[in-house]
Amino acid sequence: MPIELSTCFIAVDDHDKALAFYRDVLGLEVRNDVSYEGMRWVTVGAPSQPGVDIVLEPPLADPNASSADKEAMAELLAKGLLRAAIFKTDDCDATFEQIRAGGGEVLQEPIDMPYGVRDCAFRDPSGNMLRFVQPRG
């Protein structure tokens, strides 16, 4: 019984800024951008992975979450304490330069890690940590 990832979620505090980053800087395609019941359902994904969607959603969008929980999540996001995703690339250095040129907030320049990847890190416009890895070998 094989299991595959289909969808993951990244908390964003501004859909338009997030779309500009994930679409225009990272090169992900917009798969859905639908408004309903006061919410906005936005999904993006890598063109090379048509079966994997990333949902860009408000922090703790669960309608059953308390206002205190929502405030706590928004605070963690604002502090940049949420790790969102690790993306694989075939050229970490070129990816780094592309994201830096697009205005990404640099957290770590490309370095070789002892566990077999070349790695760099940025924050997205909402404060999420995103890592970009190139397998070595």
Give the ranges of each region predicted by the language model:
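Vicinal oxygen chelate
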Residues: 1-9, 29-123, 133-137
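Short Gly/charged-rich anion-binding patches and loops
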Residues: 17-18, 94
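Short acidic-aromatic low-complexity motifs
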Residues: 12-16
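Conserved active-site tyrosine of GNAT-family acetyltransferases
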Residues: 18-23, 99, 127
